[in-house]
Amino acid sequence: TVAVIGSTGSGKSTLVNLIPRFYDVTSGAVRVDGVDVREMAKKDLCARLGYVPQKSVLFSGTIDSNLRYGCTDASEEEIRKAAEIAQASEFIEEKEEKYDTPIAQGGTNVSGGQKQRLSIARAIAKKPEILIFDDSFSALDYKTDVALRRALKESTAETTTIIVAQRIS
């Protein structure tokens, strides 16, 4: 796990956005397993990454369809495990329709913290080689943040994890 810590506007997001090639470097290189990302097909690069942006994104559909986005062949058990790691399973299970609960476009019918946890679970369900969390824990309360980081550490030992944050927690 690598943490990129700094104040607002210090370039943390710009730095990690070079990995999925949202921007290309103007000099030097960004390498994944020794290969310059500019030499990789975007599809291949994206398949290796799980990215959770600062502003969590949810799509109209259900909780289940949102968690499967990018990993449609995930088993029910894998989806449930990802939700558990992301500390989302408790609030999902409290909903009447559970994983079949409808999600409005943009996730307007869930709280900010729930939206972040669902976005995190979606990235985890993909089982990528590299997980990037770009200030993705900011809407979480302290207790949830601690539990999520602990579960993440235990479950993603073989994954390169990059966490962008404004403060150490």
Predicted regions and their residues:
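ABC-type nucleotide-binding domain
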Residues: 1-169
